Amino acid sequence: MAIRQLMAGTLAAALLLSGCGSPRGGETGSAPADSASPQTQTTDTQKTDAAVQEEQTQPLAGVMICLDPGHGITSASTTERVSPLSQETKPAYVSGAEGEGQTEEELNLAVAELTRAQLEARGAQVVMTRQSHEATVSNQERARMANDAHVDLCIRIHADDAESGQPSGMSMQVPSGSLLGTPAIEQPSAQAAQIILQAVTQETGAQNRGLTPRSDLTGFNWSEVPCILLEMGFLSNTEENARLQTQEYRQKIAVGIADGVCQWKQSMESSQNRE
């Protein structure tokens, strides 16, 4: 599905969508009753019913998503350009945060695998930038993997950290600023982030901390496709870190992400139908 061609939709309408794979209304394309035989009508009805059933069970058929579990274990200390528009460099690999009993890279990978299962069960194709604890590709290379696959959306999965143990909740970081190699991704990324963050916080009950524009992230600046970064919670918060270690809560995050992707897809289709 050419999702990126449908990005002109309004966010307000998108947030009204709550289903995942609800059948769209409209004409069935069958012939008028006075010109079709009973057999033809039955066949057309069967085809329509089959299409509706497929849409309900596979609402993300034709959609391709890149899941990027942040960080990973590595001893590499190389740097890379932060943007195709700048000579400034940053570390190509970053270790990530650490909470009591878990590291961020472990959490990110575990949730990404659960999310992959949710998305594939709904018909989506999924590209993973990392499937082991080792980091074998840099931040720039992760972006290129999504670009080369021509995915409809890249979702970067991370966890937050703070000096104080007080902050909690989920947020989305979105691409912004003059270093974006593909400025056209800014608006559709923000639209997707808003919808998916709403779905995840609704599913988990976590505080919605909103969107944070970022102009300094290599993965955003090299991206040619809509890209968002989910901060699942604070490992520095004792209670939230404990929740993030449970399979039940991780599964809720995965379900919330998949629900959000369904709602995002519906919002894009709704926008196209209004044009």
Description of each model-found segment:
Residues 16-19:
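C-terminal motif of bacterial Sec signal peptides marking the signal peptidase cleavage site
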Residues 187-213:
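Active-site-adjacent substrate-binding region
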Residues 78-99, 162-189, 195:
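A short, glycine/acidic-enriched catalytic loop
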